[in-house]
Amino acid sequence: MDTIEYTEFSPPLAQRAAGLAQLGCASADGRTRLRRLYQDGSAKIRLPAVLADPLEAVLINTAGGLTGGDRIGWDVDVGTEASASITTQACEKVYRAASDQAEVRVKLTVGENGRIAWLPQETIVFDRAAFARTLDVELAAGAEALVLEATVFGRLAMGERASQGTFRDRWRVRQDGFLIHAEDFRIGPDITGALARPAAAGGVIAVATLLLVSPRAEALLDPVREIVGHQGGASVWSVKASGKLLARLYAGDGYQLRQRLVPLVGLLNGRAGLPKLWSL
C-alpha cells in the first residue's frame, strides 16, 4: 500500500502596509513652489488645486490606518526662504497589533529663513496597539518650525479605551547643526495605569505636544498659556539666535483637546492660520 506524504504549509503572512512620500518645495519669484514630489505604496500627498503661500500639502495613508508591521515614511524638504504647511486628511488610527509594531518615520528639513508647520490631525490609539514614531527635524540658520503631535488613547464616545499596548514617540530637533530639542515618550504595556498616575496624565486620555522654534517664541508665551489653561503648561527658552516655545496639553477626550488646539494653532501658525481640513 502506498504511503501518503503530507506537506506542512506555513500560514500565509498577513499583508502589511508600506509607504514613503517625499515633498520638496523652493522659493521662486517670491512664492513657494513645488520642486519635487515622490509617492510610493500607501503614502500619498495631495496639493490643493489653488496653490497658496505657504504651500499647503495633505498627507494620506490609503491603508486606512496602521497595525503591527506597517511602515510609513514622510519626508519634507523646504528650501531657503520657502514656506510649507503640512497636515493630514484625517486622524491616523493605530489598530490592535497581532505581532510587531507599526512605525512612522518623519523627516523635516528647512533651509535658511524657511518655515515649516507640521500639523497632522490627532493619532487615535486603539487597545493593544503597538506603535513607534520618530520625528527628525533639521533647521538651517534663521529657519522656523511649528511642530504638533496629538494623541488620543481610545474613543470614549464609542465606548473604546486603549487599556493595553505600547506607544513610543521620539523627537530630535536640530538648528544649524546643534541639538535644540529632544524627547523620548514611552508608555505601556499598562496604558490605563500609566495615564492614571497624577504625575503623568491624571486619568485623561488625550495629550498633545506643540513646539515652536522662532524668534517670536517669547512674545507668544503669555497668550499661549491663556489658551492652554490649567490642563497643561508652556515654557520658553533662548536657543541659538532664535527661541523655543514648548507647550503640552491634556484633556479628557479628543474633542476637549481640539477645542484648545484649534485656537493655539491659529495663534502660532501666523498668517497661514488653521489648516482648512481641521475645520471640516
Swiss-Prot record:
Required for maturation of urease via the functional incorporation of the urease nickel metallocenter. Disulfide bonds: none annotated. UreD, UreF and UreG form a complex that acts as a GTP-hydrolysis-dependent molecular chaperone, activating the urease apoprotein by helping to assemble the nickel containing metallocenter of UreC. The UreE protein probably delivers the nickel. GO terms for cellular component: cytoplasm. Keywords: Chaperone, Cytoplasm, Nickel insertion. HAMAP family: UreD. The keyword Cytoplasm applies. This is Urease accessory protein UreD. It is found in: Cytoplasm. Its main location: cytoplasm. GO terms for molecular function: nickel cation binding. PANTHER family: UREASE ACCESSORY PROTEIN D (PTHR33643:SF1). InterPro entries: UreD (IPR002669). Belongs to the UreD family.
